A protein has these predicted regions:
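Alpha-helix C-terminal capping segments
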Residues: 82-89, 245-256, 295-304, 329-331, ...
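Glycine/charged-rich beta-loop-alpha catalytic/anionic-binding loops adjacent to active sites
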Residues: 61-66, 219-234, 260, 272-277, ...
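A glycine-rich helix N-cap at a beta->alpha junction
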Residues: 299-311, 529-532, 576-595
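Short acidic, glycine/serine/threonine-rich loops at helix termini
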Residues: 83, 104-109, 288-292, 320-324, ...
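Glycine-rich ThDP/TPP pyrophosphate-binding loop and its adjacent helix/strand module
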Residues: 226-425, 618-754
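Conserved acidic/glycine
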Residues: 1-87, 94-97, 119-137, 146-151, ...
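Active-site nucleophile and cofactor-binding loops and adjacent substrate-binding regions
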Residues: 69-77, 97-98, 221-242, 339-344, ...
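Cofactor-binding active-site loop characterized by glycine-rich and histidine/acidic residues
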Residues: 54-57, 61-140, 147, 151-162, ...
C-alpha cells in the first residue's frame, strides 16, 4: 500500500523534476497533438485532480486526530475529472465514493469556472488561407504562394513574423542593451474562494460530519448537491446503478411526452436532452445490483426502449486481468468505449464521444477507464499517477513548468488546510430531532387534503374521463368488490388523478399480474403508463427509484414477497435514504405493491409467499401497509399515493394473497368479506391516515382485545364470533399499518379490556407481535398479554402449512388460555 506521505513526496519530487517547457504556449491554444482540450481546460482538469488528491490527504490528516470520519480516497481515479468535463453540468450524475475529481470539476462547471472551448474558426479564404500545400516532389522550402516565384520574393518583415508566432498574451521585452526577450505571463494563481475551493469545502464538511455540509448535512459523507445535478447515493456495491437505469428511462419517457393529453406534464428537473451518468468501480462491477442494472439496460435496448445512460467504470485492476473489459464489452445493447483513465486528454476525447453518442442516440453506453488504486485498499503503480500524467502533459505541451505546477499544488494545499481548520469549528448534528428531520416527514393534514382534492376532481372536472376509463360503469356501481377488485379500481382512480402515475412489473400489463389485480389497466391507460418489466425485483425497484427521482409517481409490483427479500437493499440503502442523504433536496416517492403473506388455505409459501416482514419494518422511514378488507384497501392505497406525492414517502403495500378473491367471512355465501367501493364524494370521510388502526366490536367488546393484521383479521373475527357464543365480548384491532405502528390505538384498545391477545401471522422471532408487545411495555401497560404467532419455520407446501401458521382455532384456544388467568 502506498502511504499518503509516500504518495505526496513522490508527486512533489516528480513535479519538481519536470523542468520548464522548451517553448511556451498560450493557455487558450489547443493541445499541440490536435486534442480537443485547450491548455486552460487541461489546467482546470489538473486543478480538479490536485484538489481531489489534497482532499484525500486532508481526510487522512483529520482522521489522524479523530476529527475525520471518512477515508475512502479517490487517489488514482482522478481521471474522471475529464469525464465530468465532457458532460454538461445539468446532466444528472450518480457518483461513487472515489469520484472526488469528478465532483470538483462539476462544481467548477456549474460556477462557470471551467474554460470554454475555443470557437470554431471560419473557413479560410483569400488572405486568411493557409500556406499552399507543396507540390508533389518539391520540398516545402521550394514552395511559394501564388504570385511569387520563390520564397525569397516574399516581402515580409522578420519582426512581424516573430511577433505573429508569439503565444497569445505574450510580449517582447527589450532590455537596456537592446536584447529582446519573449515573456509569457505566469499561470493564473488559484483564488482562495474559487469553485475548486468551494467544492473542497463541501467535501471537507462531509469528512468532519459538519451540519453545514450541503448534501447530507453531516448525516453521511456523500457526493451530492441538487444545484450541481449530483444525486447522492450510498454507492454500496453498485446499488445505485438500478436507479440510474430507472432515471434514464423516466427522462426519455418525459422527453417523448408520454403523459396523457388531458394531464398537465410537470416540468422535469433536468433538460430534455440530458443524459444520466453513473460512475462505479471495478469492485462494484461484479455485484448483483450492478449486474442486474446492466442486464436490464441491455434488455430494454433490445426491446426498442431508449435509455440515455452513460455508465462509467473506473477499473483499478482489482479483478482478474481483462475480466472487467470482457464483461463490459460483451454486454448486449450497451455500446462500449474505453480509454486510459490516467490520460486526461485521451479520457476527455473518448468521454466526449461517448456522451455525444448517448445524447444523440438516446441509447446506453459504458465507458471503461483504466485507473490505478493508490493509498486506501490499494497497491497500485504510483508511476501511473493521473496527476503526474496531467502535469507532464502541461509541461511538454508548453503551458506550464514543473516548478509552477508544484507551486500550484502547494498553494492549493495551504488553502485546503485553512478550509479544513475552519470546518472543524462548524456545528455538528446534536439532537435526534435534527438527525431524523428529513428522514421521512409526515404531514397528515396535507395528505388528507390531497385525498380530498383527488375526490373533488374525480367527482367534478374529471368525472367524464373517469366514466370513460371505467367503461361508463364506475366501480361504486358494480356491487360489492373483493380485495383484488378494490385494489384494481383504486389503482385506476390513482392513475386518473395523477398523470405521472406509472404501474409496472413482471406481467402486470399483458396478464394483469400474477393474480389479475392490474387486469385491464394497460387497455385504459396505455403501454407508456402500464408496462411489463423483467422479473428481477432489484431492477423493478431501480426503475421505480429513478422514476420517482424524475418526478413521476411509480407503483411497481413485485410478484412475491420472497422476491422482495432479495432486493431489499434497494429499499433500505437507496429509497429510504434519499431524503436523509440530501436534506430533502431529492426524493423518490414510490408505492411498491407486493402480494405476500403465507396462505393457510394450501398454497404454503417458502418458495414464493414468505410470511416474514421484519426486514421491511426495520427500514427507517419506510411505510408498510397491509390491507385486509376491500373497504380498507382502496382508501389505504389512496393514502399511500397521496403521501408519496406530498411527502415523497416510500410505501410498501403488502397484499394478502389468501384474501385477494375471498368473498365470505363466517359461512359460504355470506359475502361479508366484500364491500362496496366508495364514490368520490365519500373518499374524504373514509380517509385512512397512516398509523391508524381499525377496531371491530364483537359482543360486549369488554373482555378481550385481539390485535392482528392481514390474514389474521379474518381469522380473528371468526374466532371472536366463536368466543361470543361463549359469552366473551371481544374487540378486534386491525393494525392496517405495520410501520409506523398505530401505537395510540394499540394502547387505547388494550387498556379498555386489560387483556391483550396478539395474533401475528409472521414468525414468532422478529415478527410484528414483538413490536406490539414492546409498544405496550414502553407505555406502561399493566394488563395481561399473550401472543399467538407462526412458528420459526419456513412455510411448507400444501396442508402441512397449517402446522406452522396461525389458525382461527389457535386464536380461539389462545384467547381461552388468556381469559383463564
Amino acid at each position: 500500500m502506498t502511504t499518503p506521505h509516500d504518495l505526496d513526496d513522490r508527486l512533489r519530487a516528480e513535479l519538481a523534476a519536470l523542468g520548464a517547457p522548451d517553448q511556451r504556449r498560450d493557455l487558450g491554444e489547443p493541445l499541440p497533438d490536435g486534442g480537443a482540450l485547450t491548455g486552460a481546460q487541461a489546467l482546470a482538469l489538473f486543478d480538479a485532480q490536485l484538489t481531489s488528491r489534497l482532499l484525500d490527504l486532508a481526510g487522512r490528516w483529520l482522521s489522524g486526530f479523530g476529527e475525520g470520519y471518512f477515508t475512502v480516497e479517490s487517489a488514482g481515479h482522478e481521471g474522471d475529472a475529464a469525464v465530468a468535463a465532457a458532460l454538461r453540468p445539468t446532466d444528472p450524475a450518480l457518483l461513487h465514493a472515489r469520484s472526488g475529481a469528478f465532483y470538483c470539476l462539476r462544481a467548477a462547471q456549474a460556477a462557470g469556472a471551467f474554460p470554454a472551448a475555443p470557437p470554431d474558426l471560419p473557413p479560410a479564404t483569400g488572405a486568411d488561407a493557409p500556406p499552399t500545400t507543396p507540390e508533389p516532389g518539391r520540398s516545402w522550402s521550394e514552395s511559394a504562394p501564388p504570385g511569387a516565384v520563390s520564397h525569397q520574393d516574399l516581402d515580409v518583415d522578420p519582426g512581424e513574423t516573430e511577433a505573429a508566432s508569439l503565444p497569445v498574451g505574450a510580449g517582447i521585452v527589450v532590455d537596456a542593451d537592446g536584447d529582446a526577450t519573449v515573456v509569457v505571463p505566469d499561470l493564473p494563481q488559484p483564488a482562495p474562494d474559487d469553485a475548486f475551493a468551494a467544492a473542497a469545502r463541501d467535501v471537507l464538511r462531509g469528512i468532519v460530519a459538519s451540519a453545514e455540509e450541503p448534501a447530507a448535512g453531516g448525516r453521511a459523507k456523500v457526493f451530492g448537491r441538487a444545484d450541481l445535478a449530483v444525486v447522492p447515493t450510498t454507492s454500496a456495491a453498485g446499488s445505485h446503478l438500478p436507479r440510474a437505469v430507472g432515471l434514464g428511462l423516466a427522462l426519455e419517457r418525459l422527453r417523448r411526452g408520454t403523459r396523457p393529453a388531458d394531464g398537465e406534464a410537470e416540468a422535469a428537473p433536468w433538460p430534455a436532452d440530458a443524459v444520466v451518468v453513473c460512475a462505479f468501480d471495478d469492485g462494484a462491477a461484479d455485484h448483483a445490483a450492478a449486474t442486474a442494472a446492466l442486464n436490464t439496460t441491455g434488455w430494454y435496448d433490445h426491446t426498442g426502449l431508449r435509455i440515455p445512460v452513460l455508465f462509467v467504470c473506473a477499473d483499478g485492476g482489482t479483478s482478474a486481468e481483462g475480466w472487467v473489459a470482457a464483461t463490459l464489452r460483451a454486454r448486449p445493447g450497451i455500446r462500449y468505449f474505453a480509454a486510459d483513465g490516467t490520460d486526461v486528454a485521451a479520457t476527455y476525447r473518448v468521454a466526449a464521444e461517448a456522451a455525444e453518442w448517448v445524447r444523440r442516440q438516446r441509447r446506453p453506453a459504458v465507458l471503461h477507464l483504466s485507473a490505478v488504486r493508490l493509498m486506501e485498499q490499494g497497491d497500485g503503480d504510483a508511476a501511473r499517477d493521473p496527476l503526474l500524467a496531467t502535469a507532464r502533459l502541461l509541461v511538454t505541451s508548453g503551458y506550464a513548468s514543473g516548478e509552477e505546477l508544484l507551486a500550484r499544488y502547494d498553494e492549493r494545499g495551504w488553502q485546503l488546510r485553512r478550509v479544513a481548520e475552519e470546518v472543524l469549528d462548524e456545528p455538528k448534528l446534536a439532537s435526534p430531532v435534527e438527525i431524523v428531520r428529513e428522514l421521512a416527514p409526515r404531514r397528515p393534514v396535507r395528505v388528507s387534503r390531497a385525498v380530498a382534492e383527488a375526490a373533488a376532481h374525480a367527482a367534478g372536472p374529471g368525472a367524464g374521463a373517469r366514466a370513460e376509463a371505467f367503461g361508463g360503469k364506475p366501480p361504486e356501481l358494480t356491487g360489492p368488490l373483493t380485495l383484488a377488485q378494490s385494489i384494481n379500481a383504486a389503482l385506476a382512480d390513482g392513475m386518473l388523478d395523477h398523470p405521472g402515475t406509472a404501474v409496472f412489473g413482471h406481467d402486470v400489463a399483458a396478464q394483469g399480474g400474477v393474480y389479475g389485480v392490474t387486469e385491464g389497466l394497460r387497455d385504459r391507460f396505455g403501454a407508456a403508463r402500464v408496462f411489463d418489466t423483467l422479473p428481477d425485483a432489484t431492477s423493478i425497484l431501480g426503475l421505480g427509484l429513478g422514476a420517482g427521482l424524475a418526478g413521476l409517481l411509480p407503483v411497481p409490483e413485485i410478484r412475491h414477497l420472497t422476491l422482495l427479500h432479495g432486493a431489499e437493499d434497494q429499499l433500505r440503502g437507496e429509497a429510504a435514504t434519499m431524503r436523509f442523504l440530501s436534506r430533502g433536496a431529492f426524493r423518490n416517492p414510490m408505492v411498491v405493491r407486493v402480494p405476500g403473506l403465507a396462505s393457510p388455505e394450501g398454497l404454503g409459501g417458502h418458495d414464493r409467499n414468505d410470511d416474514s416482514l421484519g426486514a421491511l419494518r426495520d427500514v427507517p422511514g419506510l411505510v408498510v401497509a397491509v390491507p385486509a378488507r376491500p373497504d380498507d384497501a382502496a382508501p389505504m392505497l389512496r393514502t399511500c399515493l397521496a403521501a408519496a406525492r406530498v411527502d415523497g414517502s416510500v410505501c410498501v403495500f403488502v397484499e394478502p394473497i389468501a384474501l385477494y378473491h375471498v368473498r365470505d367471512l363466517y359461512t359460504d355465501g355470506d359475502d361479508e368479506w366484500t364491500a362496496e367501493y366508495a364514490e368520490p364524494g365519500a373518499w374524504a370521510d373514509r380517509h385512512v391516515p397512516i398509523g391508524r388502526a381499525r377496531v371491530y366490536g364483537i359482543g360486549s367488546a369488554e373482555d378481550l382485545t385481539i390485535i392482528t393484521f392481514g390474514n389474521g383479521v379474518r381469522m380473528s373475527l371468526r374466532a371472536a364470533a366463536t368466543l361470543a357464543e361463549e359469552g366473551v365480548g371481544s374487540r378486534v384491532v386491525d393494525l392496517r399499518w405495520l410501520a409506523p405502528l398505530p401505537v395510540a390505538d394499540i394502547i387505547r384498545e388494550s387498556s379498555a379490556t386489560g387483556r391483550v391477545l396478539v395474533v401475528d401471522e409472521t414468525r414468532r422471532t422478529g415478527g410484528v407481535g414483538e413490536g406490539v408487545l414492546s409498544a405496550l411495555v414502553d407505555t406502561g401497560y399493566v394488563g395481561a398479554a399473550r401472543r399467538v404467532a407462526a412458528l420459526d419455520s419456513f412455510v411448507p407446501l400444501g396442508p402441512a402449512a397449517r402446522q406452522v401458521l396461525v389458525s382461527a382455532e389457535a386464536i380461539t384456544q389462545g384467547a381461552r388460555t388468556l381469559l383463564a388467568r
